Structures are given as C-alpha cells and as structure tokens.
Amino acid sequence: MPQLIWSPQALLDVQRLYRFQAHKNQDAVKRAVTAIRQSVKVLSLQPGMGRPVEGMDNGFRDWIIDFGDSGYVARYRPEAEKVIILAVRLQKEAGF
C-alpha cells in the first residue's frame, strides 16, 4: 500500500482554507478539514481513482472532495510507493 504524503504546500493550503473560513463557522471548518483528511486516505488504497489533470503530464490527478455547497479539490501525484498530496483548493477557486 502506497504511503500518503502531504507536501508542505498542501499543508499550507489546508491552513489557509481553515483561516479563510474559521470566522464564518468554526464547527463547519473543522468538519471540512476532517473531511479533506479522511477523503484523501482512499488514495493510498487506490491511487488511480482521481481524474487526470488535462495539460499536465507525469500522472498528476485531481481528487474531488464533496463538502457543503462546493467542496474541495486535492491535486496529487501517485508514485511507486507513495501518493503525494501537492495542493488543496476550494472547487470554486480559479487557476486549479
């Protein structure tokens, strides 16, 4: 089973999302972070489940995480014995 690794950027993204939404509803943002962390765990069991990222090679994939009105997207790259979470964004964010 591949090891799940969070890149420093992905960890910063989760912190940024937390800070951005914490003033609105503390309980909801805690549930969102938990949903993100729980959802990506499946990638260590089935790393090819996400959708391939168009225009990018090297196996980059996006994993859709449903939550609330929109949800999140985790960009990741599966490798031989690891799955690297590269970034996490709101689905509504541009440029991802």
Q: Could you tell me what each predicted segment is?
A:
Residues 1-61:
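Basic, Lys/Arg-enriched alpha-helical interface segments
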Residues 47-81:
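Basic/aromatic recognition patch in beta-strand/loop cores that engages polyanionic ligands
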